[in-house]
């Protein structure tokens, strides 16, 4: 009887709250608490790639005086708390993993063909995995997939830089086999147990890489060889379109190799502005920031279009394969270095993109909104002052940190919400979480909170709301986008006014 009385009591409170919302005339965010899917722990991945002379990235994060990762960098990464860190990118086409293992003094330098200069190999498998472990992240490696078919890497002045299926399989053994002699010979007794591996990076892009059929054949060969070494690994195949193709590679990839793959990858960094007179080039946005805001919302629409397209292709194959967005930074002109990404203006794109990934969380299981770290590219989540100094989060990093720290385990739906608010909702026992982006450049939006069949008894708000959308983060003001915390005022109706352009995480007690 006591359970029934409690149920009737809660139902009465919920009904009274709904009635009060109606009487007040307040616009409400109404949540349907029915669980729709489990939220992946890998929606806030970061992507690390040695970038040579283009952006010091990995080298900038290493402290050669201490012979360790920079302490300020590690502290910032722990605060960011990514669930996965990926190593790879175009760099994987000529990366030879064995050059980055064993005694440091014996590791050779190698040319960074895509990004200029040379890499020291000071950071290899052991050091990368160590960073992941310190941050509480799972490592993800993009293997050398026969150089993605780019023939030039077979005959470089330094020799053949491509890697075959056996080389990739040997890496799996080195990382995961408890009895691997090669690893033990380097003084590393325990395996790393790396479970996430990607086959192919942008394999469909350009005119020098594999054809679709060649890539699928290589995917089958690599998957078979790698899983023979460790059947428990999870593999990501390349499924984007390329070479003017109208269709994604994913359909044919899943038809022929789907049973060998856990994820299909696409990249969403190449969002080209749609307007012929766009202000999202160079410094044009500084004269018309509100128009830049509008264009960034338009670009975020394409993220949803691309994700929905891949969902449809996977469903058409009857596959259970998940989606992995393994690169998703906002690349604007000048290439990856537009200063708008230092400003809060860019928040509307980043917050909405991350919300899209979570709303599509039944299929999207790995995602990222940025490159990881560096000292020049503004697409980074973490910016490093060099040669030493502070590390700090860019707007995209601050939003990823906010959403990651205040999130539930199951995705739920939003039945209704005031115009101008973009929302992703989730829940865990006793709490409902809302990730809210106010897409209005000039207007605040007030909303009451309601959860169907449940009483909202209290809550907290964590909000980033600069007064000026042109607010910029920099090394002399690294904490300008630190969230402000507030408690929702008690009453028959819990409400909050979301400032113009704000990004907010709301925790509701139910």
Q: Model-found features: residue ranges?
A:
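Bacterial Sec-dependent signal peptides at the C-terminal "C-region" and cleavage site
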Residues: 18-28
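N-terminal catalytic cores of secreted or lumenal carbohydrate-active enzymes
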Residues: 27-262, 266-276
